[in-house]
Swiss-Prot record:
Its EC number is 1.15.1.1. Residues 125-144 are annotated as: Disordered. Signal peptide: none annotated. Cu cation binds at H47, H49, H64, H121. This is Superoxide dismutase [Cu-Zn]. It comes from Cordyceps tenuipes (Entomopathogenic fungus). Destroys radicals which are normally produced within the cells and which are toxic to biological systems. Homodimer. It catalyses: 2 superoxide + 2 H(+) = H2O2 + O2. Keywords: Antioxidant, Copper, Cytoplasm, Disulfide bond, Metal-binding, Oxidoreductase, Zinc. It is found in: Cytoplasm.
Amino acid sequence: MVKAVCVLRGDAKVGGTVTFEQESESAPTTITYDLTGNDPNAERGFHIHTFGDNTNGCTSAGPHFNPHGKTHGAPTDAARHVGDLGNVKTDAQGNAKGSIQDSQVKLIGPHSVIGRTVVVHAGTDDLGKGGNEESLKTGNAGPRPACGVIGVAN
């Protein structure tokens, strides 16, 4: 079992933690999130970005992690970036808690997400269905109020 954790911080009030667990390279990864400070009753883009570099805030994290050169999509789409985790839904207080299983996100192997950055976006991810070029790259999810580097956990 490999475990990883990400502490999300930013220049806004958005923050939280994301944990990752994977039994073996062929097993799906369980991603559990606990986020606070978002807009109430909203859907916010949730992605893994390529670089673990936050020197200039969340913009230094680069584009979505996409080792297979695909277009942006929903987590259930065949054509998607590895880093496309869709949206998190917030409650009336702007908090989001949940867990997802993802077979493309890996902690083990050549395309591990350890050392990369999780970003919570200020807008809703259109899941690549926005009908424009930016939709196929970013899902038009907007600015990056919070992010954090994924690190190995005990």
